């Protein structure tokens, strides 16, 4: 493999920036750029050491930057290759000069995610662990971060490998029974034993899949739409949850003319919170565009926060909103409880059916805690911070687990129908292969390229 280089820290001004190199010539390339005290040579220093010096353009003898250089030799590195990390002052011009010098000395500019890709290809991590690196970078809450870390540490990989081991052991047992029926040393794979083993695998796959809904919420955020008639307090609710003024809050109905989106951490649940223009008929062209966008995001929502006005009677428009979100996960928020009551709350509870109804006075900052608790309890039972569960959050993993579950169910159905054992063997083998794809066993190269292309440059 050639040697790659990239800036591993965000571009812009900052205290420190890092340029990373990885590959067989990483140390030699850095050595040609580096000038240390007492003629120190990086090619001669020990692994996992850091060295003060300067980056110098050998052609002009110009000092480019004062640096600290980390030397990390294979195989005890992230990529299992020789790795150099040049720590310099943050700044667009200086950092790019150091990178350009590394490229001139023989490195190639890394592709997005190529360092992590090399870690995978060199056996340092499996594919699910590699994907967890990006999940960690993109985590919006502490819990999402913890889920990514447990996956990086190999908890999901370990479970998948154990399941594959159980299936492989069963397949080997079947193979011996088929090819060497005369062997008395090997116990016969009876109908009962085969059902027990396949059922055990199925239950474990189902257990993993049972965490997928919550896992996807933690990974991607809960698409949450705030709806209600104009001027019931939708934008005030958004601002209360975000805790800063993002939407325009006035007494004029219809002020929010577009869709406003913001990520919010609610008791460990990441909400992709959307405040919409009121869904109503309007002659205003700009407002009408906002209303149409509101209808679209409503269809795609995971959670609806339906806001009502405590100081006004329930209107036909309110009832239509209840009808529009029928069958969806909703929390009804009765706002403006600081004003004179006119709303029939019992009627609201009837319309809400068994969905939560929370009373608030956003002006007086009352009811927000109760709303946050309602959101958490709607999607997570017990403490969301529990580290006992292995959450499956990646869409690719979920699809493969669902396919593996179908394969094991096909095997069980075949056993019950008393089909030939070699047919059952095909279904078990397919299940084994599908589980293997989660950790990157026998994955097509184009899929690997596509997955790592989503990473940021320098990772």
Swiss-Prot record:
Q: From what superkingdom does this record's organism come?
A: Bacteria
- Biological process annotations from GO: tRNA methylation; tRNA wobble uridine modification
InterPro entries xref list: G_TrmE (IPR031168), GTP-bd (IPR006073), GTP-bd_TrmE_N (IPR018948), GTPase_MnmE (IPR004520), MnmE_dom2 (IPR027368), MnmE_helical (IPR025867), P-loop_NTPase (IPR027417), Small_GTP-bd (IPR005225)
Q: Which cofactor does it need?
A: K(+)
Q: List the GO terms this entry assigns under cellular component, sorted alphabetically.
A: cytosol
Q: What is its main location?
A: cytoplasm
Record-listed K(+) binding positions: 231, 250, 252, 255
Q: Does the keyword Hydrolase apply?
A: yes
Q: Where does Mg(2+) bind?
A: 235, 256
Supply the alphabetized keyword list.
Cytoplasm, GTP-binding, Hydrolase, Magnesium, Metal-binding, Nucleotide-binding, Potassium, tRNA processing
Cofactor, free-text remark: Binds 1 potassium ion per subunit.
Keyword Cytoplasm applies: yes
Domain TrmE-type G as annotated: residue spans: 221-380
Write out the residues that bind GTP: 231-236, 250-256, 275-278
EC number, UniProt record: 3.6.-.-
MF terms per GO, please? GTP binding; GTPase activity; metal ion binding
Question: Which subcellular locations apply to this protein?
Answer: Cytoplasm
EC primary class: hydrolase
Fetch the CDD domains from UniProt. trmE, TrmE_N
Q: PANTHER family from the xrefs?
A: TRNA MODIFICATION GTPASE GTPBP3, TRNA MODIFICATION GTPASE GTPBP3, MITOCHONDRIAL
The entry sums up its family as follows: Belongs to the TRAFAC class TrmE-Era-EngA-EngB-Septin-like GTPase superfamily. TrmE GTPase family.
UniProt-listed HAMAP family: GTPase_MnmE
Q: What does this protein do?
A: Exhibits a very high intrinsic GTPase hydrolysis rate. Involved in the addition of a carboxymethylaminomethyl (cmnm) group at the wobble position (U34) of certain tRNAs, forming tRNA-cmnm(5)s(2)U34.
- Tell me how this protein assembles: Homodimer. Heterotetramer of two MnmE and two MnmG subunits.
- Can you say what this protein is called? tRNA modification GTPase MnmE
Say which species the protein is native to.
Answer: Bacillus pumilus (strain SAFR-032)
């Amino acid at each position: 493999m050639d040697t790659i280089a990239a800036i591993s820290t965000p571009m812009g001004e900052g205290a420190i920036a890092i340029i990373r190199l990885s590959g067989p010539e990483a140390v030699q390339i850095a050595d040609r750029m580096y000038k240390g005290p007492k003629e120190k040579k990086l090619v001669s220093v020990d692994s996992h050491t850091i060295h003060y010096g300067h980056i110098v353009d050998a052609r002009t003898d110009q000092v480019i930057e004062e640096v600290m250089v980390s030397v990390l030799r294979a195989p005890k590195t992230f990529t299992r290759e020789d790795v150099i990390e040049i720590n310099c002052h943050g700044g667009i011009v200086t950092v790019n000069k150091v990178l350009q010098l590394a490229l001139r000395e023989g490195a190639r500019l890394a592709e997005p995610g190529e360092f992590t890709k090399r870690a995978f290809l060199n056996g340092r991590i499996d594919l699910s662990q590699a994907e967890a690196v990006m999940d960690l970078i993109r985590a919006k809450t502490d819990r999402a971060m913890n889920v990514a870390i447990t996956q990086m540490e190999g908890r999901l990989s370990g479970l998948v490998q154990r399941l594959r081991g159980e299936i492989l052991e069963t397949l080997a047992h079947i193979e011996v029974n088929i090819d060497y029926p005369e062997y008395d040393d090997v116990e016969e794979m009876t109908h009962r034993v085969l059902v027990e083993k396949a059922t055990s695998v199925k239950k474990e796959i189902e257990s993993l899949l049972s965490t997928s809904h919550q896992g996807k919420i933690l990974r991607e955020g809960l698409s949450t739409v705030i709806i209600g008639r104009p001027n019931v307090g939708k934008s005030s609710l958004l601002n209360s949850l975000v805790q800063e003024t993002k939407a325009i809050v006035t007494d004029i109905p219809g002020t929010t003319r577009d869709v406003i989106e913001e990520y919010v951490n609610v008791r460990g649940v990441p909400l992709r919170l959307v405040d919409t223009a009121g869904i109503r008929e309007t002659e205003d062209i700009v407002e009408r565009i906002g209303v149409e966008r509101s209808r679209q995001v409503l269809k795609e929502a995971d959670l609806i926060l339906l806001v009502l006005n405590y100081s006004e009677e329930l209107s036909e428009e309110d009832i239509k909103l209840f009808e529009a979100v029928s069958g969806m996960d909703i929390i009804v928020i009765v706002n403006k409880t600081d004003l004179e009551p006119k709303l029939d709350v019992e009627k609201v509870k009837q319309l809400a059916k068994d969905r939560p109804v929370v009373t608030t006075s956003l002006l007086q900052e009352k009811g927000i805690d109760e709303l946050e608790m309602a959101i958490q309890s709607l999607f997570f039972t017990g403490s969301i911070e529990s580290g006992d569960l292995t959450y499956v959050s990646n869409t690719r993993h979920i699809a493969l687990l669902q396919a593996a579950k179908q394969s094991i169910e096909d095997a069980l159905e075949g056993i019950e129908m008393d089909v030939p054992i070699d047919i059952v063997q095909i279904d078990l083998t397919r299940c084994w292969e599908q589980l293997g794809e989660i950790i990157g066993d026998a994955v097509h190269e184009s899929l690997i390229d596509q997955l790592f292309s989503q990473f940021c440059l320098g990772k």
